[in-house]
Amino acid sequence: SFSDTIKQCDRIQVDGKVREMTDDDRLRAKKANAEYASRGLRSMALAYRVIDRDVDINKMPIDEAESHLIFVGLTTMSDPPRPEIYDAVKRCHQAKIRIIMVTGDSKLTAKSVAVQIGLTSGKARVISGNELEKMSDDELRKALKGEVIFARVAPEQKYRIVKNCQANGEVVASTGDGVNDAPALKQADIGIAMGQTGTDVAKEAANMILTDDNFASIVAAIEEGRAVYSNIRKFLTYILTSNVPEAIPSVLFLFSAGLIPLPMTVMQILTVDLGTDMLPALGLGAEAADPDIMNQPPRKRSEHLLNKGVMIKAFCWYGLLSSLISSGAYFFVNWQNGWPAKGLAASGSVYMRATTMVLGAIVFTQIANVLNCRTNKTSIFKKGLFSNKNIWYGIVFEICL
């Protein structure tokens, strides 16, 4: 690094001539380095030492060989962020996903790049590897709760950062490519190794390999994961709903001591469960993600797939409404055919028409149900009524069956 190199220099080369290096020379070099770093450039100090030919450099101690150097100047390199990183960082902020930069660059360079890509507004605390070494775990956990950037950090220190993030209750995904990154990748909830530049050790320790080494691909994977999780919940809501109109008539049959015959035969129940419901339910699995899925905060670690919201929607809302419609259809057919309110026929043409009406009512309420399940918040017309053709293939099959 610049700071390590400049400490070993006691002379400077100016216009081809070598002279003693003054404090003013050091100050100018430091100012130039800071200026480059503030612009997001990576600077490297160039220095050399003249050694006599009769000296075997391979036998010289490293400390001696790298001392009394002649400072030549600075060279800079530009490593601009990929164009897609700006949108990826923005989407992470919208999804309430925190990004903590851990880099080997200088503090100024790290902060400049972070501001440039929109990672921070410029108020983030920048902690160097040396400062991190002196911090206690309590101090580190406190720092990790706010905006923070880690600069000049050794790969081995990433493990400590990951572990203390987890101590704060965070679900941590860590990226890395080197052998020394393996402990952090192993400790993280999701270890992500670089596919192109990553070592075999890092890939072995990771849970996931990023084939294109692109941060934007991680964000895309998060969106896809959220979409799959959401679709599973939609699938469960749809499947569980039909159990209510199937179960309530059976309960009425039991409590009426047989005065109200079963509104659905066993064959009709199997037709709904194994026939008409299956294809539309599978179509929900191919549903595109909701437009606002990346505007929602991450779910809690303790939250179950089959949560209270799914149960209420399936059993107390969609299911109850479907039960009222199907039961109403059953009693309506009997009433039309002179039901005297003293008992219902358990066989005959009236009973067959009534059970057929119940089956038809459940099928058509399930059609409405599958369309409702496609989106949680936005209107189905806004998302596109016919955008998921698989569901409509299932609906046509359901009606034909």
Where are these regions (language model features)?
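C-terminal membrane-solvent junction of multi-pass transporters and transport-like membrane proteins
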Residues: L306, M311, K377-I399
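Conserved catalytic-loop aspartate of Hanks-type protein kinases
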Residues: D177
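Basic, alpha-helical nucleic-acid-binding regions used in initiation and control of genome expression
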Residues: L185
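Hydrophobic, membrane-inserted alpha-helices
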Residues: I248-P249, E398-L401
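Cytosolic catalytic headpieces and adjacent flexible linkers of membrane translocases
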Residues: S1-N164, N168, A182, Q196-T197, ...
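Membrane-embedded transport module
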Residues: S121-S174, A188, A193-T378
